[in-house]
Amino acid sequence: MDVLGIGVLLLGKSGIGKSEAALDLIMRGHRLVADDLVEVRRTSGNLLVGWASELIKHHMEVRGLGIINIKDMFGVAAVRDEKRIELVLELIRWDQSETHDRLGLDEMVYPILEVQVPLLRIPVSPGRNVSSLIEVAARNRLLQVRGHHSAREFQERLDRALADARERRWRDDVE
């Protein structure tokens, strides 16, 4: 998917909702690159580029609807032939017994053709708006590429506030 100019590779088990989320993103103006089978090549600059095979290009399988042609249904602006892969989002089933990164400080990567791509695992459950989460992840990646890391900046502010509070408490104890 091309989400806000960021090439997003969606991963997850069958039936997790990847195609439905992609369809919702297309309806919001984002673009399909490939569904189900993404072919990937590594460029000489260690960039990854993904595309769909000619056989399934511009097509998507949606449970209950069957195979649909995104280009015919939504127009040429809803698809693109290839896109650099810049972010991997793995949709996983929500499990209350598991601990999930709530701050966004865990930086994971997903290796593709020996290139390390930033990875986020997004827990999904009924009622979660997965396409909005994907869009926010792409927006956050855009900020990170520009040097703005919200989670790190928050952690730094929190660390400073705690250090200041300890310093004030120490001064109060000394006086």
Cite the ranges covered by each PLM segment:
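Glycine-rich phosphate-binding P-loop
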Residues: 4-33
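A broadly conserved detector of short glycine/acidic/proline-rich loop/turn motifs that flank catalytic sites
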Residues: 7, 14, 44, 54, ...
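A short local loop/turn or secondary-structure capping micro-motif enriched for an aromatic residue
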Residues: 18, 58-59, 126-128
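Conserved nucleotide-sensing/catalytic segment adjacent to the nucleotide-binding pocket
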Residues: 31-90
